[in-house]
């Protein structure tokens, strides 16, 4: 069996656009008839996903798999780091939790993970025509080059040609690209098959002199200037501009608390697409205002974020709004926060034994344990959203005892979550993706506010995502020299060049 061709996208810095460029290439190659898989050896992210077989992986590779039209597979992201503090992360290997590690300990041990990475890659390479590999940060972080497993170190091990991308939108792209190339070793520079200027706004002709000089100084071709593409595709963690607080410009205002350890905030992307719902992220009492809905999102550290809510005054603000009848929704860690007590007597969540009072808005009690529940589920919402079909996944530590009405029922009849008055809690991530709950939530908020709801067919997130991925692929295909990209992999371009 022939081994897959491959191409790797590295960047001059975090946020250079590697994830979306990889998603675009996955889409392009799939459109061209190649069976394609994404791969990132090590991803650091708070947004994660549970696969069909109950394993955990980063959402960036999930989006890339969706772009390629294939089922997300944990082999596409064998190492996932989920920050649990400023100096440590939960380490997930092949979808299973290995434990929490300080950064120094992880860097000492990461070389031992190379066999896991290569087994995952080699397995994919036997099944697919093309592997699109995403690097992390910059390959020129000279303090991190020893035992590198995610940039040039990986490229050497799998013999991958490299596209190096720089973000012109933040300025200094020529220095970024030239400096990165200059700091690489000769054999590493030889792996770069081309440079990409990413996120350009304006007339590309203005760039021509700079591009020519960059090619002369680096002795590398610029394979494309990718425009700033206004596509709405799930993005990674705190670099995401959607986390910046913004005023609601729609009839309904939803305020999502921007917790210090916020995770899986991609849950709320479908709400942003609704014509009546404005979504903003707040991290202070001053920003809170008088929303129509308060959302407590998932968090990687429920206990520490509860303490932050208390210290920031946001707990008191949420309680005041709830007492006045403002609906409150908690998802996963946010659901735990809404309960009466959070029992971390084993110290598995916060690092030392303690039991804390929750916000007390739901009749629930959560006990944290080391065991993590991971499962894809289907469910039907209960009142006041009765009948809405839900699909999503659970991914959490802790077990919650409920003394109240459920938020939904799983397909086997098992009750899940809790509802009390206008306060709702659920462990279900992705609950708005099907569109039905979004419509029912909007109608519910309209009734409470006394405004007329808009009637429209529910927007399925999968359909919207497909549309956005096609827009992304079209924009990148038209900007890149695809003949050169295919040639670097030793493959034929079915479309015969740029379009």
Set out the residue ranges of the language-model regions.
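Catalytic nucleophile serine of serine hydrolases
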Residues: 332
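Flexible phosphate-sensing "switch/lid" loops adjacent to ATP/NTP-binding sites
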Residues: 1-320, 327, 344, 370-371, ...
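Extracellular/periplasmic helix-exit of transmembrane alpha-helices
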Residues: 339-347
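Core-facing hydrophobic residues within beta-strands of well-ordered domains
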Residues: 190-192, 340, 356
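Conserved P-loop NTPase catalytic core
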Residues: 348-375
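Short active-site segment of divalent metal-dependent hydrolases/proteases
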Residues: 335-336, 432
């Amino acid at each position: 069996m022939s081994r897959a061709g491959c191409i790797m996208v590295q960047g001059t810095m975090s946020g250079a656009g590697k994830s979306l460029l990889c998603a675009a290439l996955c889409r392009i190659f799939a459109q061209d008839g190649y069976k394609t898989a994404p791969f990132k050896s090590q991803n650091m992210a708070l947004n994660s996903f549970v696969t069909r077989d109950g394993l955990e992986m980063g959402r960036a590779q999930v989006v890339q798999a969706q772009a390629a039209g294939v089922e997300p597979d944990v082999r596409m992201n064998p190492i996932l780091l989920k920050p649990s503090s400023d100096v440590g992360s939960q380490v997930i290997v092949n979808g299973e939790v290995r434990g929490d590690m300080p950064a120094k300990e992880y860097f000492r041990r990461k070389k031992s993970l190379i066999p896991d990475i290569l087994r995952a890659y080699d397995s994919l390479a036997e099944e697919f025509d093309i592997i699109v590999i995403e690097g992390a940060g910059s390959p020129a972080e000279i303090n991190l080059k020893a035992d590198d497993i995610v940039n040039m170190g990986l490229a050497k091990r799998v013999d991958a040609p490299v596209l190096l991308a720089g973000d012109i939108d933040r300025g200094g792209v020529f220095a970024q690209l030239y400096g990165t190339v200059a700091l690489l070793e000769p054999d590493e520079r030889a792996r770069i098959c081309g440079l990409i200027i990413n996120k350009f706004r304006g007339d590309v002709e203005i760039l021509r002199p700079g591009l020519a000089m960059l090619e002369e100084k680096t002795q590398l071709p610029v394979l494309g200037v990718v425009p700033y593409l206004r596509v709405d595709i799930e993005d990674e963690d705190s670099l995401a501009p959607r986390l910046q607080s913004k005023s609601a410009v729609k009839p309904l205002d939803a305020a999502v608390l921007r917790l210090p350890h916020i995770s899986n905030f991609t849950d709320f992307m479908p709400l942003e697409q609704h014509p009546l719902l404005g979504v903003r992220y707040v991290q202070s009492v001053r920003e809170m205002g008088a929303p129509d809905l308060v959302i407590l999102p998932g968090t990687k550290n429920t206990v520490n974020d509860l303490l932050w809510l208390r210290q920031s005054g946001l707990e008191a603000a949420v309680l005041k709004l709830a007492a006045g009848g403002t609906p409150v929704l908690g998802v996963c860690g946010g659901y735990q926060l809404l309960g009466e007590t959070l029992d971390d007597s084993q110290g598995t969540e916060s690092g030392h034994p303690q039991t804390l009072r929750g916000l007390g808005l739901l009749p629930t009690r959560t006990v944290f344990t080391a065991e993590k529940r991971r499962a894809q589920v289907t469910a039907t919402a209960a009142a006041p959203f009765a009948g809405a079909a839900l699909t999503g996944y659970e991914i959490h530590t802790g077990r919650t005892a409920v003394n109240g009405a459920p938020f939904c029922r799983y397909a086997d009849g098992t009750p899940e979550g809790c509802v009390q008055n206008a306060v709702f809690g659920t462990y279900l991530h992705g609950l708005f993706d099907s569109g039905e709950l979004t419509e029912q939530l909007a109608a519910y908020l309209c009734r409470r506010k006394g405004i007329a709801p808009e009637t429209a067919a529910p927007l399925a997130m999968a359909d919207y995502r497909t549309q956005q991925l096609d827009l992304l692929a079209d924009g990148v295909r038209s900007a890149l020299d695809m003949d050169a990209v295919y040639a670097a992999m030793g493959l034929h371009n079915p479309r015969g060049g740029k379009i």
